[in-house]
Amino acid sequence: IRDQPRSRGLGDVYKRQTIDGPSGVGKGTLAFSLAEKLGWNVLDSGLLYRLIGFLSLKEKLETPHEIIICINNSKIKLLTNLKKRICEIELDDKVLGKELRNEDVASKASEFAKNSEIRNAIMKIQRNAYEKEKGLIADGRDMGTVIFPEAVLKVFLQASSEVRAERRANQLKEKGMSVIMHDLLRQIQQRDKEDINRKISPLKPADGSLLIDTSNLSIKEVEKRVMENYKKL
C-alpha cells in the first residue's frame, strides 16, 4: 500500500473520491461502504454503458451517432440506493433494474464503450451526476485519470488475477451457477490486457493515487486505509 501525500483542505469544493481498478478488486463494495460512512452518493460508471447497450437494443440503434442523439433526447437521472447498495438509472421517469443486467446488454455495452464519441457523451453525464448535491464516490476504470482528475482523493485497487478469479467463482456459486476456474482466470487476464492496452482511457492509476492491493485485505481494512487518508486532507 502506498499512501497518497497530504493535499489541500476541502474548503467549500465539491467533494469527490474516485475508485479505479480492474474487475474483482472490490471497487463497488468499497464505494458503498464509504458512501454509507460519509453520506455521499455513488456513481457506477459501468451502469451508464449498460444503458447505452440497452438503448441500442431497444431502439435498434446501430451507430454511435444514433445513440448520442438518443441520449441527448432522453431524460437520464442517476440514483444511489444505499439501502439496497446499488446504483440505478431513471430513464424518462422509469427506473431501470434488471433490464440493464443481462448478457445481451453487457455485450453491446462493451462494444460501444470502445468508441470515443460515446465515451465523451457518457463523460458529460458522469461529470454532472449529483453535481449540486452531497459528495460523490465514483467507481470505474478511468474515474481518476479522465472523468474526475480534480478529485480530492483517488484510490486505485489491485489484486492478483488468481484472487479475483476465486472471488468471481464464489459469486457465481452463490447464484447456483457452475464454475470452471481455468476459464474464469483466462477471461479476467484477457480483460486486464484489453483494459491496460486500449487506446482510449487505458486502465492505470491516476497521479497521486492511493494504491491498495486487496488480495489479502478485508473490506473493513481497505475502508480504514482510505478513511485515514481522507481525514488527512
Positions of PLM-derived features:
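ATP-binding Walker
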Residues: V25
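Single conserved hydrophobic/aromatic residue that forms the stacking wall/gate
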Residues: I1-Y14
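Walker A/P-loop
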Residues: G28
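NTP-dependent small-molecule kinase module
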Residues: E90-L100, A106, A169-E174, K193-L233
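P-loop (Walker A) phosphate-binding loop of NTP-binding proteins
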Residues: P22
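Hydrophobic anchor at the beta1->P-loop junction of P-loop NTPases
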Residues: I19
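N-terminal phosphate/diphosphate-binding loop that engages ATP/GTP or pyrophosphate donors
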Residues: E36-E103
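ATP-dependent NMP and nucleoside kinases share a basic, alpha-helical "lid"
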Residues: G97-A113, E117-K175
